[in-house]
């Protein structure tokens, strides 16, 4: 075992000597010269390597520090005396205002009575607050149940986006850096359609509101609109997965990266040519979405613009400029002609196309890092997530400041808000997925125990309101998508 060197031992002895000397010093009323003499004697009694000039300077500094403390101490005493004087004056004035000549005993009784009332009031408030705390702990007995239902494995690279169709039959769509988009049977986990029309990473996938048509955005600087025809296979029994509370956080070792190398999409039908390609961007197209009605589509690009297209003619209708850096996401309102775009410039913008003759824009400035996504809720809210590790809820009628802020421990990626319960699903860089309500109250964390959950960054979440077994999907850079069954008791959602 290594021993201490001579210089280190000497330094420790010197430190111990100083400590013992300093503990033995008592405060006195001696003059400044006496104090300096005492300190000089102390330093001279030690084996000091300091030159005399340096020691004298230190002594002067110590003297100044002590004088400052003395002044503070005297000021404190003077302030206390003034406070006592003011309290006495207030007591006399209060007695004069009351107009009653109270004896000393009566004043004591009155003071004790008021003190008793104050004490009783504090006890009542304390009981009420603690009862609320206890009741909130009791509600955790009805915990959110988050059950892993199905893994969707078949991509050869990380997944950027996940989406669920809005038409029947309900299928799952994934967009991957392996240049493909896959459609899956939610029940069986089997690949139904493979789209290979892009020459770059597929960054997002969204489905037409009424037809079997998909919209994908890609790193090849285009967005493709393509048709699919699916027939669901016969459902098979789901794997028996034990229900795990969403608040558990038991980590597990990473699985072998080769687990996801099996190409489940090799034997599924392939679509190679789109119905139309949208080609007006000069950079990566990072996201795309359908406007309400499905007759127009919007794209977001790293060229700092968002484009609005006519789907039937593929013509560019509007080019939305104003962001100072690359765009990261775009989203459309489910019932109105509104678009929100997110950017690395720490802002997101709301574009209003409800008036055909003019479109307005509002800029939201509330984050300190890249805004990774901003999405609409059913009501008049927008929820934004950022690399600054926060999620903010905004009211479209009052856009100056957020109405709720959620602070987390990791960067937030593409969030999703459920239509029915208005629950926000937060995918994180640290492999976690957390659930919050629209008021910012944490509801659950998806389990990562028993070798379940994501092993790499979670890029996106998507809710499915209509499916009976899986109502939340997540995807990440572990090359898989996961289907979850989330049961949030109504008790947890009470405000």
Curated annotation (Swiss-Prot):
Residues 1-34, 237-268 are annotated as: Disordered. SMART domains: WD40. It holds the Pfam family WD40. Keywords: Cytoplasm, Nucleus, Repeat, WD repeat. It comes from Xenopus laevis (African clawed frog). One of its GO terms (cellular component) is cytoplasm. The keyword Ribosomal protein does not apply. WD repeats lie at residues 154-194, 197-236, 280-319, 322-361, 366-404, 407-446, 453-494. PROSITE patterns: WD_REPEATS_1, WD_REPEATS_2, WD_REPEATS_REGION. Residues 246-264 have a biased composition (Acidic residues). Residues 22-31 have a biased composition (Polar residues). The keyword Cytoplasm applies. PANTHER family: WD REPEAT-CONTAINING PROTEIN 37, WD40 REPEAT PROTEIN 12, 37. It is found in: Cytoplasm; Nucleus. This is WD repeat-containing protein 37.
